[in-house]
């Protein structure tokens, strides 16, 4: 299982690098308007990173719940990914906040989006910290998998349904 996670991580890293290159090559990464600059940063960098961290935590947590055992390496891997997730989530929140400050017309929708996004992500973080890392393996692996999948899908859905259209409007 560990080898497939490592291979998947490499593949996603290359895909994210290609996404960043697209933003750079198209001039989007350096948009001069603060509101679109920060929203683009969220779409190109922060949100995909959160999605990737959640994906890794989904795999790690599901594995632990399936085996009903938490080894030292798994504990370490989950802890590292939780730390990385918190950094990525902070970057998302900062991008949304800065975009809202730069464009008060976006404030209410971005605050709502931030609240929804944090609520879903925090469900995953809380379960990992309060249950799995403390040796509570009662949750069914499929239920955990589904919970994390909801958070991942929401991050991409909100990006495609709300952030990208907002960026497109700002760039016109």
Feature locations, PLM:
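Hydrophobic alpha-helical segments
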Residues: 1-172
């Amino acid at each position: 299982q560990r080898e497939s996670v490592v291979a998947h991580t490499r593949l996603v890293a290359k895909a994210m690098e290609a996404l960043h290159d697209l933003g750079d090559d198209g001039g989007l990464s350096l948009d001069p308007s603060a509101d679109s600059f920060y929203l683009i940063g969220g779409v190109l960098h922060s949100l995909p990173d959160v999605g990737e961290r959640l994906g890794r935590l989904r795999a790690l947590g599901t594995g632990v719940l399936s085996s009903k055992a938490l080894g030292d390496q798994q504990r370490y891997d989950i802890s590292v990914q939780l730390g990385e997730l918190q950094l990525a989530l902070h970057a998302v929140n900062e991008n949304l906040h800065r975009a809202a400050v730069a464009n008060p017309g976006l404030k209410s929708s971005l605050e709502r989006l931030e609240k929804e996004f944090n609520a879903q992500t925090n469900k995953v973080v809380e379960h990992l910290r309060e249950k799995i890392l403390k040796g509570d393996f009662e949750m069914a692996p499929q239920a955990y998998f589904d919970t994390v999948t909801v958070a991942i899908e929401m991050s991409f859905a909100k990006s495609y349904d709300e952030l990208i259209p907002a960026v497109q409007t700002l760039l016109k």
